[in-house]
Structures are given as structure tokens and as C-alpha cells.
């Protein structure tokens, strides 16, 4: 038994002593050695994945691209970002109105529907970008300007301004598409976006007018009744 232990100990010690010489002779593959000059140790999985991703040629030409100007492609990416920002703002509003100290749950449901709708708008533009042979470049989404939306009237006024800004951006994109001779993009915007934006602006304008007429925000009961009867009836349809 002791002789077996002595035999294995001797060979293990010999292997450990020779390990530095083995590592010294190891040469990393050229693709790694040039990227990671810290020695023969292999790169971490995260760094290796990043290097592989960065080495991919994301600018290779599309086989389906036709009559799609680079300016239109860039403008669509900006519009995607704006639609996601609008969704982010509406999401903030939705969960503000479901707080225990606000408790206007139909306001919350209304703004949550708006948030989902804006996200769908962004996804539809992403699908268009791929259909036309463009490349999606997502950007940082700006956080909402506030976390406390004060009252229903203030939130509706902010939503109205937001929809007007989104609509103006869509109109600018439509003008650009027309200037670049892109009837498909013009038709896409007219069919899926511009008419819907006009309806949303009118709806929000009506809500703001009715809240003001009812005495909001000074009359606290006004927003409660608006939440219960106006927005409550809308959520049932």
C-alpha cells in the first residue's frame, strides 16, 4: 500500500514540476494572440464573444434592398426610438395611476393600452426595416421627464403633446420618403400610422377638454367621475 502511494506521489510531483515548461511552450492561436496580448491564457467567454460579434461584417449589402435611401433607413431607426420612448412614457403613466395613493385604475388601463400600442408601432417599423433590406440600429431610450404625473389632466396634456411630437416626426419621415421617390414607404406610413395618429390626437384633445370642463384638477371628484364613466366605458369596448 505504501509502495503504491510513493509511486503515485512521485509521478504527480514530476507532472506538476513540468507544467510551467508546458505552458511556456503553449502558443495561443494567432486570432486570439493579436486580440489578447496578455499572454497565452485564453480570453474569457464574454470577451471572446464580443470579439467574434465585432468581427462580423454588419455592413454587407442586402439582396432585397431596392429604392431605399440611406437617409430613410436612418430616419426609420430614429422613429423606432421615438415610438419606444412614447411607450416608456405611457408605461410610467399607467403604473403611476395604479398607485395606492392615486387609485384611478381606468386611467391606468388607458395608458397601458397606449404603451402597448406604441411598442407595436416600433415593432412594425422594425419589420419594415428588414423587409426593405435596411439595418436596425437600436439606440438608448430616454427616460420620461417625470415620475410623478400629478393628476389625470396633467397626464392627458402630456400625452397630447407627446402624440403631436410623434405625429410631426412621422410627417417629416413621409416628406423625406416623398423627396427620395419612395412610394412604398409613403403608402406604409399613410396606411398604418398617419390616420391613427390623427385619431389619437383628437381623442386626447377631447379628454383634456372634458376634464377641464368638469373642473379638474381643482375639483377632485371630476377625475374620479371621468375615470369611472368615460374611461371605464371605453375599456369595455
Curated annotation (Swiss-Prot):
Signal peptide span: none
Reactions the enzyme catalyzes: 4 Fe(2+) + O2 + 4 H(+) = 4 Fe(3+) + 2 H2O
Source species: Mus musculus (Mouse)
Family, per entry: Belongs to the ferritin family.
Compartments, as annotated in UniProt: Mitochondrion
Residue stretch of the organelle transit peptide: 1-49
Domain spans labelled Ferritin-like diiron: 66-215
Protein's recorded name: Ferritin, mitochondrial
E.C. number(s) listed in UniProt: 1.16.3.1
Claim: Flavoprotein is one of the keywords in the record: no
Pfam families in UniProt: Ferritin
Binding site for Fe cation 2: 118, 163, 197
Record's subunit section: Homooligomer of 24 subunits. The functional molecule is roughly spherical and contains a central cavity into which the polymeric mineral iron core is deposited.
Alphabetical keyword list: Iron, Iron storage, Metal-binding, Mitochondrion, Oxidoreductase, Transit peptide
InterPro entries xref list: Ferritin (IPR001519), Ferritin-like (IPR012347), Ferritin-like_diiron (IPR009040), Ferritin-like_SF (IPR009078), Ferritin_CS (IPR014034), Ferritin_DPS_dom (IPR008331)
Amino acid at each position: 500500500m505504501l509502495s503504491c502511494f510513493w509511486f503515485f506521489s512521485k509521478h504527480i510531483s514530476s507532472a506538476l514540476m513540468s507544467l510551467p515548461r508546458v505552458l511556456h511552450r503553449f502558443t495561443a492561436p494567432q486570432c486570439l494572440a493579436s486580440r489578447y496580448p496578455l499572454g497565452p491564457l485564453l480570453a474569457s467567454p464574454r470577451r471572446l464573444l464580443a470579439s467574434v460579434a465585432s468581427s462580423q461584417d454588419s455592413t454587407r449589402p442586402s439582396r432585397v434592398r431596392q429604392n431605399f435611401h440611406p437617409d430613410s433607413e436612418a430616419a426609420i431607426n430614429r422613429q423606432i426610438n421615438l415610438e419606444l420612448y412614447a411607450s416608456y412614457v405611457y408605461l410610467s403613466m399607467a403604473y403611476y395611476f395604479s398607485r395606492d395613493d392615486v387609485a384611478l385604475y381606468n386611467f391606468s388601463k388607458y395608458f397601458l393600452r397606449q404603451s402597448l400600442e406604441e411598442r407595436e408601432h416600433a415593432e412594425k417599423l422594425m419589420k419594415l426595416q428588414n423587409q426593405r433590406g435596411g439595418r436596425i440600429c437600436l439606440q438608448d431610450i430616454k427616460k420620461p421627464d417625470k415620475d410623478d404625473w400629478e393628476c389625470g389632466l396633467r397626464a392627458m396634456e402630456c400625452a397630447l403633446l407627446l402624440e403631436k411630437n410623434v405625429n410631426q416626426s412621422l410627417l417629416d419621415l413621409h416628406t423625406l420618403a416623398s423627396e427620395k421617390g419612395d412610394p412604398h414607404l409613403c403608402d406604409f406610413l399613410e396606411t398604418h400610422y398617419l390616420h391613427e395618429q390623427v385619431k389619437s390626437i383628437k381623442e386626447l384633445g377631447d379628454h383634456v377638454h372634458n376634464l377641464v370642463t368638469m373642473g379638474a384638477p381643482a375639483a377632485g371628484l371630476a377625475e374620479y367621475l371621468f375615470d369611472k364613466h368615460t374611461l371605464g366605458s371605453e375599456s369595455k369596448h
